[in-house]
Structures are given as structure tokens and as C-alpha cells.
Amino acid sequence: MVPFFDKTQTVDQANALPGRTTPMPVATLNVVTDHSMTQVPDGLEVAIFAMGCFWGVERLFWQQQGVYSTAAGYSGGYTPNPTYREVCSGQTGHTEVVRVVFDPKIISYKQLLQVFWENHDPAQGMRQGGDVGTQYRSAIYTLTPEQQTEAESSLQRFQQAMEQAGDKRAITTEVAPALPFYYAEDDHQQYLYKNPEGYCGLGGIGVCLPPQG
């Protein structure tokens, strides 16, 4: 008998799928921005966010002025070079993420954090709306100590704003230094540009991120 696997419980490393050594083939260019999905030009920076299904999350960020490129992928887990099917099984430890390459002279990391907090529900644990599983958990994966500090500060401010709005739930967003990022299959890249009527479960809770004091 195959044991039941609870997709709302994060797998540990010993029980994660083995994955593979070969990276996922990835298109050279983002079809929306016409910029590279893999290269980061001098002066630009990278952010990684998880807000549920990455289709809508990627569209949200490519719409922001100052965002150079975006890519859908997987991070936060153990399985190297996972497939979408493997991530959806809950046995990789990964969550669906979007890698955002941005120009800090046009849009700051703080502004990206505001987009993050105000456009999903960060207090749902291992789900986002009707999408249930560890791959839909909310997360901010930081690339620098400065990003880590800003992300932690923003979480505290948004928690206070939720409480002031009468929402007493605890934020479940994971804030942690980034583990390796793995590109999703090409079908998932810029999905809602290629499929304008496709599914998007993204939505905020009506709370705004207060400015830093």
C-alpha cells in the first residue's frame, strides 16, 4: 500500500524526491518584457517572492514599472531541478515563486514588498485561496542581508496593520535567505500573457502596508 502523503505538511530532506542534475531548459527571453530571463545586467537587483500560484504572481510583477524581467520557478525546498508535477506532489519542499529582476533606481525593494503584502493573503498557511498545498505557501526569499532586514520589518508592520483592521490571524509568510532557484517549465513562463483567460487566484485582504517609521 502506498502511504498517504499530506500535501499541507512540508516534507523533510530525507523524504524529498531525488530530482535530477539536469536543469530545466529555459527560454532566452521573457516574452512580455523582451529581456533576458537568466541574465542580470549591472545595476539591477533580484527579488524572490511566493504568493500562491505563480501564474498570477508573475503577471503582477511584470506590470510594475521598473521591473526588468520575471521568471516563474520553484524554491525553498530540497529537490534539485524539480518538475511542476513533482512540486505539486508536495514531496519536493518547494513553493511556487517568481524571480523578479528590477531596477532599484526606478522601483525599490521596499516598494516590491508593498506589492507583495497588499496582493495576497499572507495568513493562510499552506494554501492560497482554493489552492491547497505547501507549494502555495507565502514566502519572501532574500538575496542580501539588507533584503532580509527590510522583509522582516515589513512583516511586522503588516501584522500590526492587520490587527488594527480587525484581522487577528498570525502571518504565516516564510522570510528566509534564498535557497537555489529552479526555473519552471516554459509552459508556465509568462503564462497569463500566453493564456489571457487563464486562472489567476491572486487577491489581497484589503490591508495596506504602513510606511516605515
Swiss-Prot record:
Q: Which SUPFAM superfamilies match?
A: Peptide methionine sulfoxide reductase
Enzyme class of the recorded protein, top EC level:
oxidoreductase
What's its catalytic activity? Answer: L-methionyl-[protein] + [thioredoxin]-disulfide + H2O = L-methionyl-(S)-S-oxide-[protein] + [thioredoxin]-dithiol; [thioredoxin]-disulfide + L-methionine + H2O = L-methionine (S)-S-oxide + [thioredoxin]-dithiol
Cysteine disulfide partners in this protein: none
Q: Which GO molecular function annotations are given, in alphabetical order?
A: L-methionine-(S)-S-oxide reductase activity; peptide-methionine (S)-S-oxide reductase activity
User: Active site located where?
Assistant: 53
Q: Which GO terms describe its cellular component?
A: cytoplasm
- One short Pfam family name for this protein? PMSR
The answer to keyword Oxidoreductase applying to this record is yes
Provide this UniProt record's keywords sorted from A to Z.
Answer: Oxidoreductase
Q: Which GO terms describe its biological process?
A: cellular response to oxidative stress; protein modification process
Q: Does the keyword Oxidoreductase apply?
A: yes
EC number assigned by the record: 1.8.4.11
To which protein family does this belong?
Belongs to the MsrA Met sulfoxide reductase family.
What role does it play?
Has an important function as a repair enzyme for proteins that have been inactivated by oxidation. Catalyzes the reversible oxidation-reduction of methionine sulfoxide in proteins to methionine.
Q: Provide the protein name.
A: Peptide methionine sulfoxide reductase MsrA
Gene responsible for this protein: msrA
